[in-house]
Amino acid sequence: MTFSWLPGQSELNLQQDLLDTAAFAAKHYAATLDARAVFPDQAALAALAVFDESIPEDPCDPSVVLETLATHGGPATTASSGPNYYGFVTGGSLPIALAARWLGDAWDQNSALGRMSPIAAQLEQTVEHWVTDLLGLPKETLMGLVSGSSIAGLSALAAARSHLYAKAQWPFAEKGLQGAPPIHIYGPDSLHGSIDKALSLLGFGANQMHWLATDSEGRLLPSALPTLAPNAIVILQAGQVCT
């Protein structure tokens, strides 16, 4: 296969060239990370105007895309994976994690089903075994991997909601929330904002949420926890982003 805008350039050769260019730019960024300012300067921010363009009507040289990203995008990054960043709780990427992610991107797997990607299914199963072992959960525990903590909170609350409705013999799948038995939510008063949003997405109103006192480390005070009815969900945390 050749590309009409790059006469004689094969797809394979172009892909190799692009990967080499991206790898070079990434290595340079990683090598200079320690010396980078945490936040870009005004010149770098002003240079972002190069990306403010109309949707192109014709294709362009892919190498120009990478060059533009490296030249104007790289300096406008926040060095959150570097040693001088003390902002949000943002973990730096380990070298092996970054390299493995590159490889995973090249594999470009659809992991919806095990048959669609045996390696993705195997890795997820291995992580499942590790987590259940670390937490002392039953061996028959099943787990699903999500994109991050916000979706994890949403998924956990959805599972808790379904469990309570099943115990109350409410056919949630057929009738939904309309007319469903009330559920009350109890949690620390310093919960992450994503929990509020997750509860709202799941159909819980403010009157169903009861926020309880915490100590200076964001831990729930046991004395603040009331006697719970069977229709209650308790949200706990070991701390929060400021502790």
Residue ranges of model-derived segments:
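N-terminal entrance/gating region of PLP-dependent enzymes' catalytic architecture
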Residues: 2-140
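Active-site core of PLP-dependent enzymes with the aminotransferase class I/II
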Residues: 221, 237-243
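PLP-dependent aspartate aminotransferase-fold enzymes
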Residues: 90-104, 108-233
